[in-house]
Each structure stands twice: as C-alpha cells, then as structure tokens.
A protein has these predicted regions:
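N-terminal Rossmann-like NAD(P)+-binding domain of SDR-like oxidoreductases, especially those catalyzing
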Residues: 1-175
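Conserved C-terminal active-site "lid" loop/helix of NAD(P)H-dependent oxidoreductases
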Residues: 218, 272-299, 303
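Glycine/proline-rich active-site loop of Rossmann-fold NAD(P)-dependent oxidoreductases
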Residues: 125, 152, 168, 177-191, ...
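Hydrophobic "lid"/C-terminal helical patch
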Residues: 16, 225-229, 253-256, 308-315
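Amphipathic terminal alpha-helices
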Residues: 25, 291, 303-318
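A short C-terminal helix-loop "cap" of Rossmann-like NAD(P)-dependent dehydrogenase/epimerase domains
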Residues: 131-138, 166, 193-205, 259-273, ...
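Non-catalytic, hydrophobic alpha-helical segments
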Residues: 221, 225, 241, 252, ...
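C-terminal "lid/loop" region of Rossmann-like NAD(P)-dependent oxidoreductases
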Residues: 208, 236-239, 250-253, 261-284
Length: 318
C-alpha cells in the first residue's frame, strides 16, 4: 500500500513512517521542514520518498493524494512556543492547510486519519476527558488558544466533508505523546527536562508545578493510529489516544532527576516570564481512553520510566 504521511519528517510522523514501512507499506512523506527534521528520517533507506512541500499547496497535495491508498494527516504547526511566536503561520497551516488536504482526500475518495489534539478540550475542568466533552477555551485575544481553535475547525471540516462528500475520516486526539526525536525547542516538557537533567543543569518548571498531565510513549501512540485505520468502524469517529498515570509537573521533574541520576536542581519560572502576561494553562489534562480500549482493544504498554529512558538515550546519542 502507498501511504501519504503529511508531516512525515516530524516527531510522530517519522515514527509512523517507520512502522508503516516495517509492515510492508511504501511511504510518501510530505514536509516543509518548519518543525520536521531530516535527522528524523535519514535512517530510512527503502520504500520511502520525501516531498519537500507545504500542505497549503493545493496542486502539490492533489497530485500527491491521487496516487496513494491511505493518508495520515500529521502535519501541523504545534507547540506553545510556535503558537505564541508565529500565530498567523500556525493558524494558516492548521486551518488552510488542513482544508486543502481534507478536500483533496474527499475528492479522490481516499481514507484519511487526522491527528488532532487534547488541546481541543481547552481548560475544561471535567476530568478525565472523553470524546464527547465540551470545549472550554479562553478569549480569542489570548493567542494561546488559537491552536485549539484551529484544530477544532479542522475536525469540523472533516465531519462536514464526511456528511457532504462521504469522506472516510477518523480523528485521533493525541494526549502528550512523548519519545525519541521529540524536540525540546518547541516547549515540549519531557525532552526539555531530560536534556537539562543530563547536563546537571537546573530544571525549569513553568508555574508552580502542580499542573498535571498524562504522557504516552510514541510507540504506543503509533500502534493506536494503525489500529484506528485498520477497520471501517472508526470512520467518522473521534478517539482519544493517551497514556495512563497522571503526574504533576513537579513530580515529573523529580522523576526525571531520579531516573537519569542527575544532580539537577528545580527552579520555578512564572508563566509571565516564560511566555507572556496573561498566559493560561490547563491545570489538569487526563484522557479517558475507554472508547479505544473497548472498540479496538488498544491500551498503552510503556510507562513513564521507559519514556524517560528512551528520551534520555536518544538525546545522549544525538
């Protein structure tokens, strides 16, 4: 099978390419390398082609989609730093780019999975979050929420194209996927903490550290994505994909220090200093993954210690 992976040189996209090739598929990866990296795909030597291009290029996307059997739409402008530093580019990529990809998939009757995000739920205080829960986001003047808004529009476009054109689409809402190749540059907390710990440098926690998350190893997330496109019963459905084991960011920092045998200290950085005045964060973000467990018998296998070990090994060998 020929499979298109948009964002194929990115963190999750490159791991997805590895898994698809391992099962015998030919992967066409499309990436503009704004956040993706050639280092993520340089090890791939067969059944793989890379297209350096932008998902907003309608002619390129149409020509590419015509010749594939399946699409994983992983491309996005993501990460808090990216969103705050380049909000217009983020909004354009996540809305205009996704419209191009989804429309082409509908016109050519291709099966597609879109990678959405737990950011969809915003700051909804109800936890754990299931797929039918409401979005609770801040004011549009707070740029921090623009990524959540853009991904919500992407999901709405996908459902609309299913209704009007029969698009065979499945939506995966990813919760804090972590693992080798994830960059600390875009504000991703685990590689940032691990990198500091390996250097015995202070680990900077934004806020007071009581905010909590649940992390999922990228290998587990990839297994979920492949399972989601392996059956027609997931078409026009949304599935949370995440790990288990809620942990505060302070506890995460302490665990990273312990697992890496680091001499790092912990320092607390006010949100206003890390980002901008008025920045808002979610106090808790915990996925309810009962739907994917019940429907596809999927559950994450790797715990936080394994995640930290794999991230540390990758950083040490890079």
């Amino acid at each position: 099978m020929r499979v298109l992976v948009t964002g194929g040189a990115g963190f999750i996209g490159s791991h997805l390419a590895d898994a698809l090739i391992a099962r015998g598929d030919h992967v066409v990866a499309l990436d503009n390398f704004s956040t993706g990296s050639t280092a993520n795909i340089k090890h791939i030597t067969k059944n793989f082609e890379i297209i350096d291009g932008d998902i907003r290029n309608a002619d390129l996307i149409t020509d590419t989609i015509k010749d594939v059997d399946l699409i994983f739409h992983m491309a996005a402008a993501l990460g808090v730093n990216t969103i705050l530093e380049s909000p217009l580019e983020s909004i354009s990529t996540n809305i205009a780019g996704s419209e191009v990809v989804l429309t082409a998939a509908a016109n050519h009757k291709k099966r597609i999975l879109i990678a959405s995000t737990s950011e969809i739920y915003g700051k909804n205080p109800k936890q754990p979050l299931n797929e039918t829960d409401d979005r609770v986001v801040g004011s549009p003047q707070k740029i921090r929420w623009s990524y959540s808004d853009a991904k919500a529009i992407e999901e709405a476009m996908a459902f609309s194209l299913n209704q009007e054109k029969g698009l065979k689409v499945t939506t995966a809402r990813l919760f804090n996927t972590v693992g080798p190749r994830q960059s600390a540059h875009y504000g991703m907390v685990v590689p940032r903490f691990v990198r500091s710990a390996l250097k015995n440098e202070p680990i900077g926690i934004y806020g007071d550290g009581t905010q909590s998350r649940v992390f999922c190893h990228v290998d587990d997330a990839i297994e979920a994505l492949l399972a989601l496109v392996g059956t027609d019963k997931t078409i026009n459905e949304v599935y949370n994909v995440g790990g288990t084991g809620e942990i505060t960011i302070k506890e995460l920092a302490e665990t990273v220090i312990k697992e890496t045998k680091s001499q790092s200290s912990i320092e607390y950085i006010p949100y206003e200093k890390a980002y901008a005045p008025g920045f808002e964060d979610m106090q808790r973000r915990v996925p309810d993954i009962s739907k994917i467990k019940q429907n596809l018998n999927w559950a994450p296998k790797k715990n936080l210690s394994q995640i930290i070990a794999d991230v540390a090994a990758h950083i040490s060998n890079s």
